Amino acid sequence: MDLKTIAEELVAGCRENRAIENLDRLYAPDAVSVEAADMGRGRVTEGLAGIRGKHEWWDASMEVSDGSVSDPMLHGEHRFAVIFEFQGKEKQTGKAFEMKEVGLYHVTDGKIVREEFFY
């Protein structure tokens, strides 16, 4: 897949609640995910299984009541960015949250090899 197709499919998957399903299609097996801050699980997650675990943790821990995912913004031949905005609550505590973050994705050989989040 080319950059534009990967970017559009990542966004569509997020909007249609297919993010975990898209991992195998869009990510390299050795992809790396980097968070802006350590939320108790470390900032860096390596490998597709670890990234899948992050998604599963989010789904188990957070209840999203509203949100949006921007259209992808392409940058050159190998990168794109997406803006995520969500409102919801932590399932365990009921504490409400609002978040806005930018995801920067790096693509090599038709797969996402690195994602970085800024918030």
Functional labels for PLM-detected ranges:
Residues D66-S68, F97-G103:
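Short, surface-exposed coil-to-beta transition loops
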Residues K100-Y119:
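Short beta-strand edge/turn micro-motifs at domain boundaries
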